Structures are given as structure tokens and as C-alpha cells.
A protein has these predicted regions:
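Amphipathic alpha-helical dimerization/coiled-coil segments
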Residues: 2-25, 97-151
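N-terminal helix-turn-helix DNA-binding core of bacterial DNA-binding proteins
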Residues: 24-65, 86-96
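A general structural signal for well-ordered secondary-structure junctions
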Residues: 36-39, 51, 79, 132, ...
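Alpha-helical residues within the helix-turn-helix
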Residues: 57, 74-75
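Short, hydrophobic-biased segments on the C-terminal half of alpha helices
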Residues: 70-71
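Beta-hairpin "wing" of winged helix-turn-helix
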Residues: 75-84, 91-93
């Protein structure tokens, strides 16, 4: 077992609860990851910000199902939701929590597992698709770009 995993396990096992609410936060976080799809989502959102449609594509699951998992992860404090224009994106929580749970958990995810490896391969395809769409958009709109920027 490498030193990073030992440190993460230590942090996970020795979480300090500063008040009764901390215990509830910790238990809610445990419930939040108590399902394979949610653990996969957390691993993906620990790498980059993703939209619901991108996650449905990577996970090959329905939008309602992915949205439900995202809701539970946000409520557990493991993911953050933010809007960018009409889209909602999710990322691993950057909030500083005294229990150190989310970073410790991310360090323990078995990334060499075939399921996580497949997810990362599909994530790379999503990233490449984003790049292609952005390049295409700017090629099509380069001449009018100054006018487009004035609209926003």
C-alpha cells in the first residue's frame, strides 16, 4: 500500500467531529457514495467539471437516473453544482470541510479498476468533443466575434 493511500485511510478513519453536526455531515457523505454509479460520478467530477448530458454519455445511463445521483452527491456535500449560461455543471466539492472526507475518498478510488478505466477513456472522448465543438464554433464565428461578444 503506497504512502498516499495510507495517509488517506488515516484521514478517513480519524476524522474529527468538532460538533454534533459534523457527525451528521460525515454520515450523509457516506450515504452519498454508497452506490457504484455515485462513486463513478465522484471520480469523474474529481477530474473535471461535467454537465449532466456529458455524464449520461460517459456512464451510458439515463438523464433522470444520473440527475438523481447528482442530487444526492450535492446534498452529501461531495459535489458542487454551478451554472454557466443555460448549462449546469458539477465538480468535486472544493469547500473546506474539517473532516477531510472528500479528498481522502477521492484518493481511495481504485482507478485501475476496469470500470473506472472505461469511464476515463469515455471522459477523454468527451473532452476531445468539447475541443472540436469549440474550434468549430470559433471557425464559424471568427469574423463576427467582436459583434457576438458585444451581445453578452
Amino acid at each position: 500500500m503506497n504512502i498516499d493511500i495510507k495517509i488517506s485511510l488515516y484521514k478517513l478513519v480519524h476524522c474529527k467531529f468538532f460538533d454534533p453536526d459534523q457527525m451528521n455531515i460525515f454520515l450523509k457523505s457516506l450515504k452519498g457514495i454508497a452506490e457504484e454509479t455515485r462513486l463513478r460520478i465522484l471520480a469523474l467530477c474529481g477530474k473535471t467539471e461535467l454537465s449532466v448530458s456529458e455524464l449520461t454519455s460517459i456512464l451510458n445511463q439515463s438523464q433522470p437516473r444520473v440527475s438523481r445521483h447528482l442530487k444526492l452527491l450535492v446534498e452529501a456535500g461531495l459535489l458542487e453544482r454551478f451554472r454557466e449560461g443555460p448549462w449546469a455543471f458539477y465538480r468535486a466539492s472544493e469547500k473546506d470541510r474539517p473532516d477531510g472526507f472528500a479528498p481522502a475518498l477521492l484518493a481511495l478510488i481504485p482507478l485501475n479498476d476496469p470500470v473506472f478505466e472505461e469511464d476515463r477513456a469515455r471522459l477523454e472522448m468527451v473532452r476531445q468533443n468539447r475541443i472540436s465543438k469549440a474550434e468549430s464554433f470559433f471557425k464559424q464565428n471568427a469574423k463576427e466575434w467582436d459583434g457576438i461578444r458585444r451581445l453578452h
